[in-house]
Amino acid sequence: MNKNTISNIECVITKPDRHNLITVIVETESGVTGYGCATFQQRPLAVKTMVDEYLKPLLIGKDANNIEDLWQMMMVNAYWRNGPVINNAISGVDMALWDIKAKIANMPLHQLFGGKSRDAIQVYTHATSDTMEGLYEQVDKYLEQGYQHIRCQLGFYGGVPENIQTAQNPTQGSYYDQDQYIENTVEMFKNLREKYGKQFHILHDVHERLFPNQAIQFAKQIEQYNPFFIEDILPPSQTEWLDNIRNQSSVSLALGELFNNPEEWKALIINRRVDFIRCHVSQIGGITPALKLGHFCESFGVRIAWHCPPDMTPIGAAVNTHLNVHLHNAAIQEHVEYKANTQRVFPNAAEPINGYLYASEIAGIGVEMDREAAQDFPVEYRPHEWTQSRLPDGSIHTP
């Protein structure tokens, strides 16, 4: 294969709607350009610095064909490795290199992987409201749109705070009460099943808001309502407790959106402590490690449900869809409808059809960034109050 030298790398941050989205653009001497997602919205400028000041000088003049070698070099070049900033920066480059290779081959990305194992991937979306009436309205809307899987949340992560008794002069933060959350969420499941029966699969995200003993109690209480899966019932630092949950409840567990390092998921998969891996592809370093993770999971009967929130580019979401139609053990894809500005900056962003997402058949990833449109929405940093989650006594808890 003829050498295809990397001639330029650019990292662009744009905020078309609520989130700062990071795109890496890799140009080659052949004239083929690739696009990749590097979004770490809580620390966007750190990722851009990593790309501009460290990866770009390292990669200019290298052969874009050698994706595996370049990925390994980027990962070890700083000596310390596998953190959210460096992994997202590497991911942006890695996805762009795969985009280039698929464009040169004149085939959509999933065909470069080895083709499809399914026609389309089932999708779930988010229904969230402070009241059951509001939640019913959202569920009804999504059922009309053909969704068979809906993530249901009563209030924001941690639930709707009601008359929380805090300490005097409480420290600033986002307060919630774990006992209230458990009680209200179990009641939410009960109400949904009574109203809808088994018309759709219910998913729910605990978002690490419980202590391990509470997580066990919660899993036991909602088991009767047969959720499709419960996400992030514990933080990555407490995954040994998953064995205790497994021993007392048959609830399907999904975990992984906070993982960066393979050591965080190896034991979970080998010991079958989870049913679904929820890794965020750019947080683990891009397509190259995602393919390896997918095949590793398949050997142990663990299914894939990549993290795919609105705070990632439609480029990254399209990569998830290509992975999902290829990997035989892919189960479902998360999706939140794109707003108009995001669709303008990222043309060809896919939307579900009757509860399914279809991979693009355009050569490459199939979604690019309109650089001129992106300039209309410059980066705007915000302090992220929601990650300052506090219990009634004022102590910080994992968000």
From Swiss-Prot:
Binding residues for Mg(2+): 205, 231, 257
SUPFAM superfamilies: Enolase C-terminal domain-like (SSF51604), Enolase N-terminal domain-like (SSF54826)
Keywords per UniProt: Magnesium, Metal-binding
BP GO annotations: amino acid catabolic process
Pfam families in the record: MR_MLE_C, MR_MLE_N
Residues given in the record as D-arabinonate binding sites: 207, 257, 278, 307, 334
GO MF annotation list: magnesium ion binding
Subunit: Homotetramer.
Family: Belongs to the mandelate racemase/muconate lactonizing enzyme family. GalD subfamily.
Function of the protein: Has no detectable activity with D-mannonate and with a panel of 70 other acid sugars (in vitro), in spite of the conservation of the residues that are expected to be important for catalytic activity and cofactor binding. May have evolved a divergent function.
Name of the protein this chain belongs to: D-galactonate dehydratase family member VME_00770
